[in-house]
Amino acid sequence: MPRFLGRFVVGAGALLIAATAQAQGPSNAPARPWKIGGALGGTIPLGNFSDGADLGWHLGGLFEYKQPSVPVTWRGELTYHRNGLKDDYFSGQLPGIGNLDGNFSMFNFIANAVLPFGDAAKTWQPYAIGGLGLYRLKASADFNGIDISDSQTKFGLNLGGGVTFNLSGFETFVELRYHTVFTKDSNTNFIPISFGFKF
């Protein structure tokens, strides 16, 4: 999984740099109050979550709305995350269990506020982002042909930042956020690193 994630980051970064180099400045057309887009990237588990979960990936869509004379942009997101299980962790906790074929998956529905900094007319613009939402978490595994699963639906928070690149007719962005989900016993924490687009 780390090798796959490394190849993905290098490839996505190269595409982002190439697209930025071809930018011809912002369009003179009137700006719409809304945008749609998508993002994908790596999901890094933290804390107790990282004990049993490998590095993972995520894929999602977004909708943004900018009210006139309001400094923030409102963003709604639907994202799917998937992380593999660490066999060595579960083998240590349950001796004799052998190899487990399973994963952690998560859907999150999030409402965010995005606060940009600097001049919007520039080719690139940093921003802060944060919000709250509903997270549907599920752990699934196959043990000797028997399917085992457990799921929770909990609220969570996220906070982070990124950089938007204004290209000809659309935008790309790089973003890093910290998520904490208020799951039973202990919070589930993770950091997604995302490469995305909006138009």
Name every feature range the model reports, one short phrase each.
Residues 1-32:
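Cleavable N-terminal export/targeting peptides
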Residues 22-67, 191, 198:
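Short glycine/proline- and aromatic-enriched beta-strand/turn motifs that initiate or cap beta-hairpins
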Residues 24, 60-143, 191-193, 197-199:
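Gram-negative (and chloroplast) outer-membrane scaffold detector with strong preference
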Residues 32-34, 53-59, 103-109, 124, ...:
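Residues that define the transmembrane beta-barrel architecture of outer-membrane proteins
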Residues 36-46, 134-135, 172-182:
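Transmembrane beta-strand segments that form the barrel wall of outer-membrane beta-barrel proteins
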